[in-house]
Amino acid sequence: FTPTSGQVLYDGRDFVKMSKKEKVAMRREMGMIFQNAALFDSLSVLENVMFPLDMFSNMTYRDRVKRAQECLDRVNLIDAQQKFPGEISGGMQKRVAIARAIVLNPKYLFCDEPNSGLDPRTSLVIDELLSSITKEFDITTIINTHDMNSVMGIGDNIAFIYKGHKEWQGNKDEVMHRSE
């Protein structure tokens, strides 16, 4: 899409003016976790995690497998690598999605309702995993959620958006003491 007004900037560069090569390089720096796990049913857990490497890296097959296994191990799913998405729970599918999102060592991670459809205990596991991974790998993370427990558990800088407009922004203490 071509913007009708304004600009889309990525690290200070105008997205619309970027070359295809620059956009591919930019894509390598971004991880995405969707509301549903968005896994390929016909691919194993390992193959799902390897998918971004297949698309955006020049690594050998052996190195791609090794990197994907490292990410699966990080989300405690190394034993599920040969299973298919339909054979694992929703919480496990979310962890596969997290492994896939971090496999390229992104600078930025975008999460759309990462706890959607999960029970409270599994939601807490996902929150703790996202929090520890983003700190461990120094990933700037943007999470879109309606779950205020999740927001207060893992949010550092919180923005409240209503009908497409930022109503307010602050840290956890400012959110807790907000009177509006």
Describe each model-derived feature in a short phrase.
Residues 84-88, 92:
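Conserved ABC ATPase signature
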Residues 6-14:
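Conserved ABC transporter NBD signature motif
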Residues 109-112:
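Catalytic Walker B motif of ABC-type/P-loop ATPase nucleotide-binding domains
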Residues 120-122:
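Helix N-cap at the start of a conserved alpha-helix in ABC-type nucleotide-binding domains
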Residues 13-14, 61-79:
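Conserved ABC ATPase "signature" region
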Residues 103-107:
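A short, proline-enriched helix->beta-strand linker immediately N-terminal to the Walker B motif
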